[in-house]
Design a protein with these regions (language model features):
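A cross-taxa feature marking solvent-exposed loop/turn segments within ectodomains of secreted
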Residues: 20-23, 47, 61-63
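Structural detector for short beta-strands of small beta-barrel domains
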Residues: 4-20, 56
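Beta-strand/loop nucleic-acid-binding surfaces
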Residues: 27-47
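OB-fold/S1-family single-stranded nucleic acid-binding modules
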Residues: 27, 57-78
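Short aromatic-glycine-enriched beta-strand elements
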Residues: 18-30
C-alpha cells in the first residue's frame, strides 16, 4: 500500500457552519491566500477568528461540493 502524504492548508476560521459537540465533528470555513475553503472533520472545538493549520485531503461531496476533509487541525499560535 502506498502511503499518500496529506495536504496542508492554513488560514483564519471565518465561520462555524456545523458543530457536533458529542463527537467533535465540525464543518467550518477558513480564509487563506484570498480563498474561502470549507473544511470538515473531527477536529474538536474551534472559534471564529482563530488561525488554524489543517492536514487532510480535498474531496468532492455529492451534495455540498468541494470540501477539505481534515484528519488533523491545530491552532496556529502567534
Amino acid at each position: 500500500m502506498v502511503d499518500e502524504q496529506l495536504e496542508q492548508i492554513e488560514g483564519v476560521v471565518e465561520d462555524i457552519i456545523y458543530e457536533n459537540e458529542d463527537n467533535g465533528y465540525v464543518v467550518f470555513e477558513i480564509s487563506g491566500g484570498g480563498v474561502l475553503t470549507v473544511v470538515c472533520g473531527i477536529v474538536g472545538e474551534l472559534h471564529a477568528g482563530e488561525s488554524v493549520i489543517c492536514r487532510g485531503r480535498y474531496e468532492n461531496h455529492a451534495t455540498y461540493g468541494r470540501q477539505f476533509h481534515a484528519q488533523e487541525c491545530e491552532t496556529d499560535m502567534p
